[in-house]
Design a protein with these regions (language model features):
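Exposed, low-structure sequence patches enriched in small/polar residues
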Residues: 1-216
Length: 218
C-alpha cells in the first residue's frame, strides 16, 4: 500500500472591491482589485516514517500584476521516539498592483475635499520573501525536556510604475511622477527556547530565552 499523498489546487478569484486604504487615510477611496488565478501542487511522503518530506509549488497570475511564484518544503525528522525536528521553508517572488503609496496635495489633483485637491498615488510592486521555521523537541527523560523555535524572515519590497487613481471603485490610473523612494527590506529573527526540569515531583525549573530582532533597511 502506498501511503504517499499528492494534491492539486486551482483557485479562481473574481474582481472585488477593496476598502483597506480607507483605514490608512480618510481621503482614500475604495478601489477595484483585479481578478487573479492560482495553481498549487504538493506531495507528502509516508507519514509513518522517521523522515517525512512535503515539497510544494504555487503559481499565481493576474493580468496587471503578472506572474508570481512560491515554493518551499517541510521536512520532519523523528530519528528516535524522544527527538522531533522539523524545518519549514518557503521562497516567494510575487508581483502586485495597486499598492498604496501616499496622498499628494496637488492643485490639479483628481479628487477634492474641504482642504483642496489631491492625488492618491499607487504603485506596482515586486515582493521577494524568504521565510523559515525550525522546531526542535527533545525529551531527555520524562522530567527533563528542551523545546526550541527559531524563525528567520526576510522580505524585500520594490516599488515601481507610480500612478494616480483616476476614478473610485475602478482600476483606472494615470502615470504619476513621484519623487519618493518607497523601497524597503526587513530582516527579522524570532525564537523561543525553553528548558524544563522537574527535579522532584511537582517542583519545576524553567529556563526560557526569547529572541526578537528586527532590522528595517530603507
Amino acid at each position: 500500500m502506498n501511503y504517499w499523498n499528492f494534491g492539486l489546487e486551482l483557485e479562481f478569484n473574481p474582481e472585488t472591491y477593496q476598502d483597506d486604504d480607507t483605514y490608512r487615510d480618510d481621503r482614500a477611496k475604495i478601489i477595484k482589485d483585479e481578478a487573479w488565478q492560482s495553481f498549487n501542487t504538493w506531495f507528502t511522503t509516508d507519514r509513518r516514517k522517521k523522515y517525512v518530506l512535503r515539497p510544494w509549488f504555487k503559481i499565481n497570475k493576474g493580468e496587471i500584476r503578472g506572474i508570481g511564484t512560491e515554493y518551499g518544503a517541510r521536512i520532519t525528522l523523528k530519528p528516535t521516539n524522544n527527538i522531533n525536528f522539523s524545518i519549514n521553508s518557503s521562497i516567494e517572488d510575487r508581483p502586485g498592483s495597486m499598492q498604496w503609496v501616499y496622498i499628494v496635495d496637488n492643485a490639479n489633483g483628481t479628487f477634492e475635499d474641504a482642504n483642496g485637491k489631491y492625488d492618491i498615488v499607487y504603485a506596482n510592486i515586486k515582493r521577494e520573501q524568504l521565510n523559515t521555521e525550525l522546531r526542535l523537541n527533545i525529551a531527555f527523560t520524562s522530567r527533563m525536556t528542551f523545546e526550541a523555535f527559531y524563525q528567520p524572515f526576510n522580505v524585500k519590497m520594490d516599488y515601481k510604475d507610480y500612478s494616480s487613481l483616476e476614478r473610485e471603485k475602478s482600476l483606472s490610473i494615470n502615470p504619476f511622477s513621484y519623487n519618493g523612494d518607497e523601497d524597503f527590506e526587513i530582516d527579522n529573527q524570532r525564537g523561543t527556547f525553553v528548558y524544563r526540569w522537574e527535579y522532584k515531583p511537582g517542583s519545576l525549573v524553567y529556563i526560557v530565552y526569547n529572541l526578537n530582532l528586527s532590522l528595517i533597511h530603507i
